[in-house]
A protein has these predicted regions:
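Helix-to-loop junction immediately C-terminal to a conserved catalytic motif
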Residues: 65
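Conserved ABC ATPase signature
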Residues: 154-158, 162
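Conserved ABC transporter NBD signature motif
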Residues: 73-81
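Conserved ABC ATPase "signature" region
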Residues: 81, 131-149, 258
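A short, proline-enriched helix->beta-strand linker immediately N-terminal to the Walker B motif
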Residues: 173-177
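Short catalytic/signature loops enriched in Gly
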Residues: 4, 17-25, 30, 241-323
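P-loop NTP-binding/switch modules centered on Walker-like glycine-rich loops
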Residues: 180, 184, 188, 192-268
Length: 323
């Protein structure tokens, strides 16, 4: 396999927890939002990052673009560590790295017309003449299933599905290599979700795009992804090619996550979650899942399992699984 387009190595991000008097005193603890996450994304590949809300998947995605500054770890894009770059050094790479947000409408200037919103990234990157930029905007509108008449409209005049198409168009207008899709279809109904996913797949194949697709929806992630990473409490607990993960699910949390989806054709291995979701702070010990895992042992409560490869491309962090 070719060299990865993107490599994340041992990414860490914590947020301070302050006492009753707030920031007058040092933090009393730290919440681990992302804990030692490592993954790779190849050219033309879709990597699905799935997990419950608050598991750190969005923080991981935003760290790639510098929207969140990690505490430690490496984010290598074409071998260059993005965490070590200044704003001036990062700026030329922004054309390669784009994002589609869950709430696209709130990320757009409501006073700008759609044509202006799509031209703006090209102006910032000094791409083309005014006429060339206008033509490219019209082309991208057609490509994402909007019409030329939308050029003069405002974002609030669009439906939910059209707004997401606009978000994808804005991300693609300067021909990026990697797009981070953060819950891009979660607010849409199922029929519109299908249209957006099919469009993303078509555009990806046509442009050899790499996608980091972040979602809490197992079905959506399975549909669009070549490989999937499962996150729980800031930790990557299992990773495999899509079909391998769904036919050979190993981590108890992944099994429970899959079992929560109705009619999933996996009735033979159902794991129900018990216990409370813990606070993943600096004082937390052991496996992140031990408070809710039906198979937890003393070893699980004392020692965090290392991520190990159980077969080519399939990694899992669980003491029960032999490497």
């Amino acid at each position: 396999m070719s060299e990865p387009l993107l490599q994340i190595k041992n990414l860490q991000k914590k947020y301070p927890i302050y006492g009753p008097l707030g920031k007058m005193f040092p933090p009393v603890n730290h919440m681990r939002a992302v804990a030692d996450v490592s993954l790779e994304l190849h050219e033309g590949e879709t990597y699905g990052l799935v997990g419950e809300s608050g598991c750190g998947k969005s923080t991981t995605g935003r760290s790639i673009l510098g929207l969140v500054k990690p505490d430690s770890g490496e984010i290598l894009y074409k071998g260059k560590d993005l965490t070590k770059l200044s704003d001036a050094q990062f700026r030329p790479l922004r054309a390669d790295l784009q994002m589609v947000f869950q709430d696209t409408l709130s990320s757009l200037n409501p006073r700008s017309r759609i044509g202006q919103l799509l031209e703006e990234p090209m102006i910032i990157q000094n791409i083309g003449t005014p006429e060339e930029r206008r033509q490219k905007v019209l082309d991208i509108l057609t490509m994402v299933g909007l019409s030329e008449e939308h050029y003069f409209r405002y974002p609030h005049e669009l439906s939910g599905g059209q707004v997401q198409r606009l978000g994808i168009a804005r991300a693609m207008i300067i021909n990026p290599k990697l797009i981070i899709c953060d819950e891009p279809v979660s607010a849409l109904d199922v029929s519109i979700q299908s249209q957006i996913l099919n469009m993303l797949t078509r555009l990806q194949k046509g442009r050899n795009l790499s996608l980091l697709f972040i979602s809490h929806d197992i079905g959506v992630v399975r549909y669009i992804s070549h490989r999937i990473g499962v996150m729980y409490l800031g930790t990557l607990v299992e990773e495999a090619d899509t079909e391998e993960l769904f036919t050979n699910t190993l981590h108890p949390y992944t099994q429970a996550l899959f079992a929560s989806v109705p009619d999933f054709e996996r009735k033979e291995r159902k794991v129900s979650l018990t216990g409370e979701l813990p606070q993943y702070t600096d004082q937390f010990k052991g496996c992140v899942f031990h408070t809710r895992c039906p198979y937890a042992t003393d070893k699980c409560r004392e020692c965090a399992p290392a991520m190990k490869e159980v077969c080519p491309g399939h990694r899992v962090a669980c003491h029960r699984v032999e490497g």
